Amino acid sequence: MILKPTSVGRFVFSPLGGEPLDVGAAWRRADSDEMSGWRSRHIGYVLQHGGLLPYLTVRRNIELPRRLLELPLGRVAEDLAGRLGIRQQLDKLPAALSVGQRQRAAIARALAHEPPVVIADEPTAAIDPLNAERITALLARLADELKVTLIVASHAQDLMRHAGFTLIAHQIEAADEESMTVSVCSAEPMAA
C-alpha cells in the first residue's frame, strides 16, 4: 500500500537507481508502444471511480482485457463476478449498478486477464465506509488467492490493516502543476 497525504492528488515515483526485476533486458530498450503492450499484459488497473465503459454491459467490461489481448473468454466473467457478488449484474449496464457494484466490476476487470500485478488508485474513495472495508478485504483476499501483487494508493489509513507492506509518503514536492513526486518515504512492513 502507498499511503499518501490527503493534500496530494496525483504523484509519480521516480526511480533513484536499480533495475526492474523479472521483466527481461529488452524492457529497458522498449519504445512507448512496446511498454504499453507490456503494461496491458502484466498490469491490471482499478481506477478511483471504476472506469467502466458505460455502453458495455458488466460482462463485456470484465471481458475487455481478455478480448484486447485475444485470450479465450471461457467463464472468467462469471467466475470473477460470482466471487465478487455481482453475478446477477453481468448483463446490466454500469449506470444500473450501485457505486460499490461498479467498483467490484472494475476489480473483476482488473483481474480478468490474470496479470501478475494489479494497481488500485483510491479503490474505495467513492464508497461508504462499510462497503469500503468489505471491498478492500475482498480485493486483498482475491489478490492473495490469485497470487497477484496488489499495489493500492490511498489516503485512507484504515485500509493499511489489509496491506502486507506500506510505503508512507512523508514529504511530497511538486514536480509540475499536474503531478507530485515522492521525495522521501518510509517503508513499513505490517505487524502480523
Residue spans for each PLM region:
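Helix N-cap at the start of a conserved alpha-helix in ABC-type nucleotide-binding domains
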Residues: 129-131
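Hydrophobic anchor residue at the start of the ABC signature
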Residues: 107
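Catalytic Walker B motif of ABC-type/P-loop ATPase nucleotide-binding domains
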Residues: 118-121
